[in-house]
């Protein structure tokens, strides 16, 4: 009877050890899977950050200003290139953008406010057509009220006919 008890005790101990090892190996697999998922998430976050940095670099190169011809709200090829850089960044995050329309000093105050608004709206419409939600875009017109270049020459006026992207 004592021998049988020792044998069943040993059997129980072996069964217990096998069960314990099996349980531990299951946790190891879960831990490995968890660590792998965390590693992938970190890699994805790092890649997203690198992509956003590349887009910000592209915006720095393209600029934040879209220029317009005299008495026009039609975007130029260069203006579309600037807007495209901002669109690419806006499509990677949930930030909003403010488009500030400006004019040169020629024309009445009322006319220039309306022209600045048409310019800001032209850029907004281009962004919306290219995938940016209109709810993320604010437009405002300053008309001739906030010039970047003082003077009454074509060189000054051309710098003031713009939409600033904020």
Label for each model-derived stretch:
Residues 2-3, 83-85, 150-151:
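A generic local structural motif
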Residues 19-23:
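C-terminal motif of bacterial Sec signal peptides marking the signal peptidase cleavage site
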Residues 25-97:
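Periplasmic peptidoglycan-binding/tethering modules of Gram-negative envelope proteins
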Residues 102-166:
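Periplasmic OmpA-like peptidoglycan-binding domain that tethers envelope proteins to the cell wall
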Residues 5-6, 72, 107-110:
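A short, structure-level motif marking secondary-structure boundaries and short turns
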Residues 2-13:
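Bacterial N-terminal signal peptides that target proteins for export
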């Amino acid at each position: 009877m004592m021998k049988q008890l020792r044998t069943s005790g040993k059997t129980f101990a072996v069964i217990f050890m096998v069960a314990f090892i099996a349980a531990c190996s299951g946790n190891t697999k879960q831990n490995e899977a968890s660590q792998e998922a965390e590693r992938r998430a970190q890699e994805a976050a790092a890649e997203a950050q690198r992509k956003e940095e590349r887009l910000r670099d592209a915006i720095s190169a393209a600029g934040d200003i879209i220029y317009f011809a005299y008495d026009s709200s039609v975007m130029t090829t260069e203006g579309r290139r600037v807007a495209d850089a901002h669109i690419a960044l806006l499509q990677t995050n949930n930030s909003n953008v403010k488009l500030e329309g400006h004019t040169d000093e020629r024309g009445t105050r009322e006319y220039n406010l309306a022209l600045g608004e048409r310019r800001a709206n032209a850029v907004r419409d281009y962004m919306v057509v290219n995938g940016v939600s209109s709810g993320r875009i604010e437009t405002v017109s300053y008309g001739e009220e906030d010039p970047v270049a003082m003077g009454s020459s074509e060189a000054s006026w051309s710098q003031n006919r713009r939409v600033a992207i904020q």
